[in-house]
Amino acid sequence: GLGDVYKRQAARGVKDFIMITLGTGVGSGIVINGQMVYGHDGFAGELGHVIVRRGNGRLCGCGRTGCLEAYTSATGVARTAREFLELRNDESTLRQLPIQEITSKDVYDAAVSGDKLSQEIFEYTGTILGEAFADFIAFSSPKMIVLFGGLAKSGELIMRPIREAMEKNLLAIYKGK
């Protein structure tokens, strides 16, 4: 599980951190004082299901609308691509693909190749993540947030907008740390 991963990976020796896996869904774990937080029923730390868009948010697999996972998982990125392609007229190499078959990997490949619309999709996704991370920091003050999963391997395409949105939305006491 996530707890086993951190012992061998980036957070070794760190007692307060959050792990986020950006895959088909959004997995997460919160570690405080070296202990994984489970809550009274074992379900604490479902950060993929915090609401990031109220009102007219996307339907999530959990049945609610507006969850982080609906926007920032691999399937969320593919959905953003479909929405951008349907609602906008921008040129994009993604238009050469059958719209319902577009994957987050297709968006990544296009973005790396210079496709502006695909780069905007990463900007949009990273901004949502960064805003959420600012909130996560406010409630647990982690020393770090460790990202895993396919989307995390997108490097600066995803990390730059995450950092910018997070820093912009942090409480003043956390800025620059």
What are these regions (language model features)?
Residues 29-33, 37-39, 51-53:
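Short beta-strand-to-turn element immediately C-terminal to the catalytic PLP-Schiff-base lysine
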Residues 17-21, 27-29, 59-61:
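Short glycine-aspartate micro-motif
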Residues 19, 49-51:
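Conserved hydrophobic/aromatic beta-strand scaffold that supports enzyme active sites
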Residues 1-6:
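Short, small-residue-biased leader/transition segments that mark boundaries at the very start
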